[in-house]
Regions:
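Active-site neighborhoods and metal-handling regions in enzymes and metal-associated proteins
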Residues: 1-154
Length: 154
């Protein structure tokens, strides 16, 4: 689910996926893929990198079950955060490949990834917030998301 807050007028936004009761192999595999996608994007973030370079790391819409980038818009995605929930830069295959923006120190944005499970009805979604430093990115979200969290396990 999407967790959204405001603090002194500034917005936050991050996704976490939970399994309730138990996680199947399909759930864990989807989560692992979503985590790999977001980790590769976070590792790419530093001043001078452009948004098309980040978007190019993500799979095409067809690779994860959608017919077009418009249909999949917002699933492999990045957006600035500030006084608004969705600010620039916008990072997606739909617009960044043709209209890249250079990443600069001080930018604050969220990166979101999604991957469908092979069971036909489940999926995993992860979103992390970060600030661009002089040398890379500092993660702002502290709620753990390295592994799929199972609540009320049985």
């Amino acid at each position: 689910f999407d967790i959204i807050h405001a603090f002194n007028g500034y917005r936050t936004c991050y996704y976490r996926t939970f399994a309730v009761g138990r996680a199947t192999n399909a759930h864990r595999d989807a989560y692992k893929k979503a985590r790999e996608l977001i980790d590769s994007a976070i590792a790419m973030v530093k001043p001078g990198v452009t948004t098309d370079q980040i978007a190019a790391l993500w799979p095409t819409a067809q690779e994860f079950g959608f017919s077009s980038e418009m249909e999949a818009f917002g699933l492999q995605f990045g957006h600035g955060l500030g006084l608004g929930l969705h600010e620039r830069p916008v990072i997606s295959r739909l617009n960044s490949l043709e209209n890249p923006v250079e990443i600069e120190p001080g930018m604050v944005f969220a990166l979101e990834t999604y991957w469908p499970a092979n069971d036909g009805h489940s999926a995993a979604r992860i979103e992390e917030e970060l600030v661009v430093t002089e040398t890379g990115a500092e993660l702002l979200t502290l709620f753990p998301a390295e592994e799929l969290f199972v609540t009320n396990p049985y």
